[in-house]
Amino acid sequence: MSSRYSERNGLSETEKMTLPKVRKRKAQLVDEIEALKNEVREVDEELDQVYYTHPKSKEYHKIVVNGRKKFNQDPWKALDWLASRNVVAKDPQALALWMKAGEGLSKSAIGEILGDNRPFALETLDRFTKEHKLHDVPIVPALRQYLFSFRLPGESQKINRILEKFAEVYANQNPSYGNADQAHTVAYSCIMVNTLLHNPNVKDKPSLEKYIEMNEQLLEKGAITIEQLTEVYESVSVTQFKIPDEVSTSGKGTVNDILLHAEREGWLFKQSSNPLFSGALSWKKRWFVLSENCLYYFDQMTDKEPKGIITLANVGIRKVEAPSRPFMFEIFSLSDGQIKACKTEQDGRLVEGRHSIYKICAVNDEDMRSWINAISRMMAPQQHLLARPKSTH
């Protein structure tokens, strides 16, 4: 029995007619998978081509830049990489100085290190806080200065641990102020009144008199004075404590600003949006940066301007079940309209995006899930949807 006969045996006429198309599509999928594997290998080779060089060389500068990106993406995972490339030693004092300088570092990533309760992190928090010069600085401005050097974590235990260290260092540098317990009470009071006065979800804003009344027990214990409460209230009511990621010193929208506030960065593959392309759309490797409610993508990691910007407003995100690309997810419009976005054309023109869905592919399952989670967190303050996986055929 011939292989040709065996292959077609038992097939209907319709199935026999369809078979060549199936074979052709199978061949296309094999080619696409192989192309993706090649692109992934190229990315891995680029990331692996890192080696020790002289601190003043151009190659070393590239290593430092790459190290900052890794730290911003996953600070704990990056520590060994940074130490092995002689960027910063895995030592609390060295890391504290590096984070205090803060050049190109995400303040959220710094806060992630400082808020941890591992012994290494606690020692780093101590060294980092002691690097702040708080002598003869009033406590409220001192706390502003301190909290602007990183982003305070959201968990109450981490906040309290960081404020305790600040209070300890402040009291040591200002012996005439009082003890660390009193400094901690004032610092915590700053955070509390900042929330009461400036959080839009708090409808009943307390007056100074009401605020003093709320702290009656602390006053009775001598943990704080009316003068200190008044100083805190008047300062914070005029100028709220700004989260570092809410402000910029380098001009909002510049690459430096985008990278400074980056929550995640890395190589991903974006489906081509060329409407003239026939058949399956091509995939392009792009350097993606998640920053300040936007997803930026660049042709190269070192580009000065983004190729495109996707605004994460009124959008959802979900995994896409696609056998040919198992690590795909998509950002889609919740209103069935166009997603607010823009891109730079080849002639340099900036044009508005015209898409309701952006399909993106990661290199592995872990990377895909990390991106989905990071984008979901970025969308959390807004109305968003983390949808069930979507199947494609």
UniProtKB/Swiss-Prot annotation:
Q: Which GO terms describe its biological process?
A: regulation of ARF protein signal transduction
Q: Which InterPro entries does the entry mention? A: PH-like_dom_sf (IPR011993), PH_domain (IPR001849), Sec7_C_sf (IPR023394), Sec7_dom (IPR000904), Sec7_dom_sf (IPR035999)
Q: Which gene encodes it?
A: grp-1
- Which GO terms label this protein's molecular function in UniProt? guanyl-nucleotide exchange factor activity
Its function? Promotes guanine-nucleotide exchange on ARF. Promotes the activation of ARF through replacement of GDP with GTP. Plays a role in cell shedding during embryogenesis, probably by promoting the endocytosis of cell adhesion molecules.
Q: What are the record keywords, sorted?
A: Coiled coil, Guanine-nucleotide releasing factor
Per its UniProt entry, which superkingdom is the organism in? Eukaryota
Please give the residue ranges the record annotates as the region Disordered. Answer: 1-21
Q: What organism is this sequence from?
A: Caenorhabditis elegans
Report if keyword Coiled coil is assigned: yes
List, alphabetically, the GO terms of the cellular component aspect. Answer: midbody; nucleus
SUPFAM superfamilies to which the protein is assigned, alphabetical: PH domain-like, Sec7 domain
Q: What is this protein called?
A: GTP exchange factor for ARFs 1
Q: What is the lineage of its organism?
A: Eukaryota, Metazoa, Ecdysozoa, Nematoda, Chromadorea
Give every PH domain span.
261-377
Q: Where is the SEC7 domain?
A: 53-239
Residues folding into a coiled coil are: 12-54
Is Calcium found in the keyword set?
Answer: no
What are the Polar residues biased-composition ranges? 1-12
